Structures are given as C-alpha cells and as structure tokens.
A protein has these predicted regions:
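Short connector loops at helix/strand junctions that flank enzyme active sites
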Residues: 30-33, 49, 67-69, 104
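Glycine-enriched, solvent-exposed interface loops adjoining structured elements
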Residues: 19-20, 31-41, 48-51
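Short, charged surface segments at domain edges that flank catalytic/cofactor-binding sites
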Residues: 1-34, 60-65
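Histidine-centered nuclease catalytic patch
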Residues: 40-85
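Polybasic, low-complexity binding patches
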Residues: 60-68, 79-115
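C-terminal, charged low-complexity interaction regions
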Residues: 122-198
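A structural signal for short, well-ordered beta-strand segments and their strand-loop junctions
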Residues: 36-37, 50, 73, 108-111, ...
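Acidic, Ser/Thr/Gly/Pro-rich intrinsically disordered interaction regions
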Residues: 103, 108-110, 119-130
Length: 198
C-alpha cells in the first residue's frame, strides 16, 4: 500500500503503515545505500537502518506519512550513551534547518585531514556537531580513512591530467548503483584539486 493511499484511510499514522519493508527499499535505493546524514552504509533490512522523519513525528504529525519528509538513516549507535549517538538517533525530536534530500548539503561542508566535518555557516556547523553529532570518533575515523586513501593516490598522481582526476571522482560517484561509504570526503577533496588545475 502506498503512503498516499494509507494517508487517506481513517486513523492512519506511520506506526500502522504496513509497507515499511518496501519503503525502506525505496529510501535505500534513492540514497544509493548511504545514510542521509553521515554517509555510512545502510541496507533495507529491518534492524539495519531507520526510517527518519526529517520533520519529527512529535512536532509535525501531519508530515509523518509524507514521502518527501522521509529519509533512510543509519542506526546511529542506538542504545549507546548520548555522547556516542549520531544521526537520527541523536537528533530525536530536534529540528534541522536543512533537509539533505532537498538541499545541496555538500556545498556547505568541508573536511579536515583528521576526518572532522565542518561548515563555515555557523548554524549549519552547530547542527552538524550538536544535533547530528557527526564528529564522533567512529565517523571521523571512517572519513579519515577515505581521505588517507585519496591522499595516498594523490602522492602518485599529483601531475595527472584533469581527465584522470575526473575518472577518479567518477569512481566515488558512479552514475548508478550504490555509492562508496563516506565518498563525499573524496569527492570534495579531489574536486578542490581539480578546480586548481589550469
């Protein structure tokens, strides 16, 4: 049953929506296998991801069955101490100003060599750190690992022509199929290098 059909039924809400398996599949496919917030791998199996309500159900009940309000998120260290939680688990009922499905989030972000993700925009940076907690050690280490691999490649290809760098970017962002976890780190770094080549 589609969300639209279910929404038109009497006493419908997200809890009694029965096609969550199909919904998980659609979200994972649309997001190409990555968490909407941290870029970790998600899969459509129950217990391997969460269906995130960008506008939380508690404050925006009218949007709980709106597909444009739904995202696929990782489990975000659910059940662990608050300071280790991230993504939807950490966000809970807090509001986010930017929806990653409707906004070019990547244009607001940069990465440090230690894997830290940050933004020059004050409120965006606050939400990255305080609401989503995207700089927990686990996530920083994963981003650093991707960046280290790119830096190692760059050592041997720093004089490569633009076409070769573009092909490397395309490996991280192919036109179809699943994306590499934390790929945006590599795409960001390589794109910056590419922009400097004349």
């Amino acid at each position: 049953m589609s969300l639209t059909t279910h929404r038109n039924e009497l006493h419908s809400d997200f809890d009694n929506y029965t096609a969550k398996k199909e919904l998980r599949r659609a979200l994972v496919s649309e997001q190409r296998g990555l968490c909407c917030y941290c870029m970790a791998r998600i899969s459509a199996e129950r217990g391997r991801m969460k269906i995130e309500h960008w506008h939380c159900q508690a404050h925006y009940p009218a949007e709980q069955l709106s597909y444009r309000n739904l995202l696929g998120a990782c489990l975000g260290e659910e059940g662990k101490p608050y300071e280790l939680q991230h993504c939807d688990t950490r966000k809970g009922n807090q509001d986010l100003r930017w929806n990653p499905a409707n906004f070019d989030v990547s244009s607001q972000l940069s990465y440090r060599l230690d894997g830290t993700i940050e933004s020059d925009h004050g409120e965006f940076n606050r939400q990255v750190n305080e609401v989503l907690n995207l700089n927990v050690p686990f996530l920083k280490n994963n981003r650093k690992g991707v960046l280290d691999a790119v830096l190692e490649w760059w050592k041997h290809h720093r004089h490569a022509p633009k076409g070769r760098i573009k092909r490397k970017i395309d490996k991280y962002a192919p036109t179809g199929g699943q994306l590499t976890p934390f790929c945006q780190v590599a795409i960001w770094w390589l794109s910056r290098k590419l922009a400097r080549i004349r």
